[in-house]
């Protein structure tokens, strides 16, 4: 029994049309990929949906295949002088124009949006790991994950302590170097200062200063004190004598 041939016509329902387009597009790209692999052929497909969305497939590089087609068409034009070559070249230019049009830009925006979503997921995961390193949101972790986190924290602590010790040693070395420089500067300034005599004039002892006649000041003061005491004694005798009848 012969298979009934199905009539090909435009699908009226937009939803059904979109579903059919997606299925047929995947099948078309699959056949193109099989052709490229089985026959070692360069295959390029460009499809625009009714909404202007671009879909393309290339077994190698799309631009390289288009350039190859352009070169081949020009060579055929030189040999056969076919008038359709100019039309083919115009179609290639038009295809590249569409490739750089809004549909292609929309595709690039979709790719960038996908990359942005991936980066946001990575950022959220890194933020969660950072909070867990601070001891937050540990409820969902298993024992093995907690042990691994403990090892990571211990390794990080060892690196921090090692770095701190290295910085301490560098600061100590810097202080020692500055101390040596100050000592050298002190010696240089001391060498530049004039020599001051250390033996000065002797300070006289006031208690043992000699007078002009060779007597010391102590002996002179003793003599004066004794003389004054004798004068006081004489005066007292005179006053006593005058007072008697």
UniProtKB/Swiss-Prot annotation:
SUPFAM superfamilies: SRF-like. Gene3D superfamilies: Transcription factor, MADS-box. The keyword Zinc does not apply. Residues 197-245 are annotated as: Disordered. Its main location: nucleus. Signal peptide: none annotated. InterPro entries: MADS-box/MEF2_TF (IPR050142), MEF2-like_N (IPR033896), TF_Kbox (IPR002487), TF_MADSbox (IPR002100), TF_MADSbox_sf (IPR036879). It is found in: Nucleus. Expressed in roots, shoots and developing panicles. Expressed in shoots. GO terms for biological process: negative regulation of brassinosteroid mediated signaling pathway; positive regulation of transcription by RNA polymerase II; regulation of transcription by RNA polymerase II. Residues 109-199 form the K-box domain. One of its GO terms (molecular function) is protein dimerization activity. GO terms for cellular component: nucleus. PANTHER family: SERUM RESPONSE FACTOR HOMOLOG. This is MADS-box transcription factor 55. It comes from Oryza sativa subsp. japonica. The lineage of its organism: Eukaryota, Viridiplantae, Streptophyta, Embryophyta, Tracheophyta.
């Amino acid at each position: 029994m012969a298979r009934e041939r199905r009539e090909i016509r435009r699908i009226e329902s937009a939803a059904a049309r979109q579903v059919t387009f997606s299925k047929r597009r995947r099948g078309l790209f699959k056949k193109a990929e099989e052709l490229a692999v089985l026959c070692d052929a360069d295959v390029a497909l460009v499809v625009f949906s009714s909404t202007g969305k671009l879909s393309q497939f290339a077994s190698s590089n799309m631009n390289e295949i288009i350039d190859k087609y352009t070169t081949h068409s020009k060579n055929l034009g030189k040999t056969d002088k076919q008038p359709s070559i100019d039309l083919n070249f115009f179609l290639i230019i038009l295809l590249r124009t569409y490739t750089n049009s809004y549909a292609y830009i929309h595709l690039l925006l979709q790719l960038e949006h996908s990359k942005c979503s991936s980066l946001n997921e990575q950022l959220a995961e890194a933020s969660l790991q950072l909070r867990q390193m601070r001891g937050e949101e540990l409820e969902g972790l298993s024992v093995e994950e907690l042990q691994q986190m403990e090892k990571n924290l211990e390794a990080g602590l060892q690196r921090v302590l090692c770095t701190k010790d290295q910085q301490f040693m560098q600061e100590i070395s810097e202080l020692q170097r500055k101390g040596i420089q100050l000592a050298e500067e002190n010696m240089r300034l001391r060498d530049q200062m004039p020599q001051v005599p250390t033996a000065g004039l002797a300070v006289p002892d006031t208690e043992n200063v000699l007078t002009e006649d060779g007597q010391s000041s102590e002996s002179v003061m003793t003599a004066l004190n004794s003389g004054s005491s004798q004068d006081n004694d004489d005066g007292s005798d005179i006053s006593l004598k005058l007072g008697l009848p």
